[in-house]
UniProtKB/Swiss-Prot annotation:
Subunit structure: Homodimer.
Residues where NADP(+) binds: G166, A167, S168, I232
Pfam families (UniProt xref): THF_DHG_CYH, THF_DHG_CYH_C
Enzyme Commission no: 1.5.1.5, 3.5.4.9
One GO CC term on file: cytosol
Keywords carried by this UniProt record: Amino-acid biosynthesis, Histidine biosynthesis, Hydrolase, Methionine biosynthesis, Multifunctional enzyme, NADP, One-carbon metabolism, Oxidoreductase, Purine biosynthesis
InterPro entries noted in UniProt: Aminoacid_DH-like_N_sf, NAD(P)-bd_dom_sf, THF_DH/CycHdrlase, THF_DH/CycHdrlase_cat_dom, THF_DH/CycHdrlase_CS, THF_DH/CycHdrlase_NAD-bd_dom
Record protein name field: Bifunctional protein FolD
Family: Belongs to the tetrahydrofolate dehydrogenase/cyclohydrolase family.
Species name: Photorhabdus laumondii subsp. laumondii (strain DSM 15139 / CIP 105565 / TT01)
One GO MF term attached to the UniProt entry: methenyltetrahydrofolate cyclohydrolase activity
Main function: Catalyzes the oxidation of 5,10-methylenetetrahydrofolate to 5,10-methenyltetrahydrofolate and then the hydrolysis of 5,10-methenyltetrahydrofolate to 10-formyltetrahydrofolate.
Biological pathway: One-carbon metabolism; tetrahydrofolate interconversion
Length: 291
């Protein structure tokens, strides 16, 4: 039986609609709409596409959206100065600096300059530490989005053997923490992993995030497994595919996320959720005064 499709596009739209309702309620009650600042340095075409989708999502849910498009000649000091200004701006609840940054700018220094309570990407050491301590606040967007996909599809993750392919700071490593919270026994594989096929064949839940088209052959998938494909790879003919051989894998898996239309929309929806959360948990005047 073919796998059930995990429709990230529909679930993401539902989440955005839920956030929009909450924003309308806030405004009707005389409170301000959440504010998100999006910073883009340089003219990377892929980054421009991602940033545009995030700005559209902000407008759709009624957020205040501020855009800062900086030239690729921007210095690290200039970027850090902008972040300092946004940290001190009471109308801004979230700051997103689109990665990658141009050569000569230290990604780590920039991300750590964002106040943890405005770190809606969830990359600051404070927020990663909270997730590690099982007391999450603002969680990394893609891992949280995947956890939400599984939850909204009614998939029980407790006791599953979960395997993550890829150990990046953006997906693989924080995803392992999310899956521990979700009750999985979790393995993270990477470029030094031996016998990758063996690990894949043991996975009840497989999450692949390596950025290589059709990296995982479908015949490796354990029958009945849940497959989450994070990869977004554009071929020479313009077609976009994932890291998993979808056609073959979908004949073996019980659930599978497509590319496009799976994880990608959830990353943006989670950014919107995180911005609302930052506003309501950290920055609402009424809440702060009541502490």
């Amino acid at each position: 039986m073919p796998a059930k499709i995990i429709d990230g596009k529909t679930i993401a739209q539902t989440i955005r609609s839920e956030v929009a309702v909450r924003v309308q309620q806030r405004v009707a009650a005389g409170r301000r709409a959440p504010g998100l600042a999006v910073v883009l340095v340089g003219e990377n075409p892929a980054s421009q596409i991602y940033v545009a989708s995030k700005r559209r999502a902000c407008e759709e849910v009624g957020f205040v959206s501020r855009s800062y498009d900086l030239p690729d000649t921007t210095s690290e000091a200039e970027l850090l100065n902008l972040i300092d200004q946004l940290n001190n701006d009471s109308d801004i609840d979230g700051i997103l600096v689109q990665l990658p940054l141009p050569a000569g700018i230290d990604n780590v220094k920039v991300l750590e300059r964002i106040q943890p309570d405005k770190d809606v990407d969830g990359f600051h050491p404070y927020n990663i530490g909270r997730l590690c301590q099982r007391a999450p606040k603002l969680r990394p967007c893609t891992p949280r989005g995947i956890a939400t996909l599984l939850e909204r599809c009614g998939i029980n993750t407790y006791g599953l053997n979960a395997v993550i392919i890829g150990a990046s700071n953006i997906v693989g490593r924080p995803m392992s923490l999310e899956l521990l919270l979700a009750g999985c026994t979790t393995t993270v594989t990477h470029r030094f992993t031996k016998d990758l096929r063996h690990h894949v064949e043991q996975a009840d839940l497989l999450i692949v995030a390596v950025g290589k088209p059709n990296f995982i052959p479908g015949e490796w998938i354990k029958p009945g497994a849940i497959v989450i494909d994070v990869g977004i790879n554009r071929l020479e003919d313009g077609k976009v595919i994932g890291d998993v051989d979808f056609e073959t894998a979908s004949e073996r898996a019980s659930w599978i996320s497509p590319v496009p239309g799976g994880v990608g929309p959830m990353t943006v929806a989670t950014l919107i959720q995180n911005t609302l959360q930052a506003c309501e948990e950290y920055h609402d005047v009424e809440r702060i005064e009541g502490c």
